[in-house]
Amino acid sequence: MKILYSLRRFYHVETLFNGTLALAGRDQETTGFAWWAGNARLINLSGKLLGAHVAHAGLIVFWAGGMNLFEVAHFVPEKPMYEQGLILLPHLATLGWGVGPGGEVIDTFPYFVSGVLHLISSAVLGFGGIYHALLGPETLEESFPFFGYVWKDRNKMTTILGIHLILLGLGAFLLVFKALYFGGVYDTWAPGGGDVRKITNLTLNPSVIFGYLLKSPFGGEGWIVSVDDLEDIIGGHVWLGSICILGGIWHILTKPFAWARRAFVWSGEAYLSYSLAALSVFGFIACCFVWFNNTAYPSEFYGPTGPEASQAQAFTFLVRDQRLGANVGSAQGPTGLGKYLMRSPTGEIIFGGETMRFWDLRAPWLEPLRGPNGLDLSRLKKDIQPWQERRSAEYMTHAPLGSLNSVGGVATEINAVNYVSPRSWLSTSHFVLGFFFFVGHLWHAGRARAAAAGFEKGIDRDLEPVLFMTPLS
């Protein structure tokens, strides 16, 4: 047992039991980790762990490529993306690939190319994962010290952190370059109902960009979720990319300060817990972003937001009844409030009825009808365009309020289409994953802190069935 290639494979930073503990003649060294411990057996095998990560990346990219081609094969140009159960093509369309005015798909070939490129990439990653998992060195420290590491090496860990930050920064700049130089991105706010355009006037003013972080998360404010123009989004990615790259360089060139060395637990499982916490926060933010934001996630591709569908319903019936002779400026509803229009507590003119709760919605089909004090009555009477009517009628019947069995729509809308909006899927999945990752953070953080404190942790394996089975060999 003691003469294997690397003794370190049997001396883990995190162990299920302390090194001296023996139960029923079994100890950590002879039994290893339980089957349910996943990659824990690779904690100190940097080469094998690299293989696991590369193979995992290959599986992810393979799914992306395969699902991409599946969606292309099933795509029907005559129907909106959000009615077809598509979850990948809306992202490609948002980046400006294959779409024209109004979000109409004019070319599916870029989507096909994307799928094929992902499949080819997954093959490369798959071969790399198999090589490092089965054929490559178990540990990298001896053969390739630059890629090797010891979990307790604080300086090496912050160097790895720095490399990751630089890669994230470069990823942010990829979006910037696409928006500025490589065809532009889809802007739902472009005049006449949205179009692909290059971003020419970036918002780089720090008071604007960081002002979003200082806003309230509640109605009318909306924190960063309230961003509603692409100049701010792309400018924010310039700031984000720059901060990530500069922060990465900082972490590569420096060593952790004394307070950081004392404050953090420096072990593989601790890093896992930190990562899960960060991903959990990202998941919760993304959940709100997808649900409420129709600029980064255009309604032409993802379907309307909930507030947008509700406001669209009020707008559609205002248009109908106005043509039938109703005076939409003065008509009263059953509660005595305005039936079509009313004033908010701050005096702005907003839609009446149950949709009053969504008074702070901003949508490209509605904003042209606003004046300095909310909705403009004269514009509502004279300036409504056919494309606004068509879009609001479409959104009215496609609220993202469906259950998973597709029974959905605004509760008061009898014409609602039974479908599951990709906005619902994206938002719900990110909330659920964000929650699971938070629980994972608590679990692994607790184990890592227990290991650092030197007391017992893990699930008792004394009665684990596999320990009573005949050895396979």
Curated annotation (Swiss-Prot):
Pfam families referenced in this protein's UniProt entry, alphabetically: PSII
Subcellular location: Plastid, Chloroplast thylakoid membrane
Function comment: One of the components of the core complex of photosystem II (PSII). It binds chlorophyll and helps catalyze the primary light-induced photochemical processes of PSII. PSII is a light-driven water:plastoquinone oxidoreductase, using light energy to abstract electrons from H(2)O, generating O(2) and a proton gradient subsequently used for ATP formation.
Name of the protein this chain belongs to: Photosystem II CP43 reaction center protein
Positions contributing to [CaMn4O5] cluster binding: E367
NCBIfam families assigned: psbC
GO terms (BP aspect): photosynthetic electron transport in photosystem II
Co-factor binding comment: Binds multiple chlorophylls and provides some of the ligands for the Ca-4Mn-5O cluster of the oxygen-evolving complex. It may also provide a ligand for a Cl- that is required for oxygen evolution. PSII binds additional chlorophylls, carotenoids and specific lipids.
GO cellular component: chloroplast thylakoid membrane; photosystem II
HAMAP family: PSII_PsbC_CP43
Subunit comment: PSII is composed of 1 copy each of membrane proteins PsbA, PsbB, PsbC, PsbD, PsbE, PsbF, PsbH, PsbI, PsbJ, PsbK, PsbL, PsbM, PsbT, PsbX, PsbY, PsbZ, Psb30/Ycf12, at least 3 peripheral proteins of the oxygen-evolving complex and a large number of cofactors. It forms dimeric complexes.
Family listed: Belongs to the PsbB/PsbC family. PsbC subfamily.
Chief subcellular location: plastid
Keywords from the UniProt entry: Acetylation, Chlorophyll, Chloroplast, Chromophore, Manganese, Membrane, Metal-binding, Phosphoprotein, Photosynthesis, Photosystem II, Plastid, Thylakoid, Transmembrane, Transmembrane helix
Propeptide positions: 1-14
Membrane spanning stretches: 69-93, 134-155, 178-200, 255-275, 291-312, 447-471
Keyword Manganese attributed: yes
Phosphothreonine modification, residue list: T15
Recorded name of the encoding gene: psbC
Alphabetized InterPro entries for the sequence: PS_antenna-like, PS_II_antenna-like_sf, PSII_PsbC, PSII_PsbC_sf
Residues recorded with modification N-acetylthreonine: T15
Domain of life: Eukaryota
Any one GO molecular-function label of the UniProt entry: chlorophyll binding
Bilayer topology: Multi-pass membrane protein
The keyword Kinase belongs to this UniProt entry's keyword annotation: no
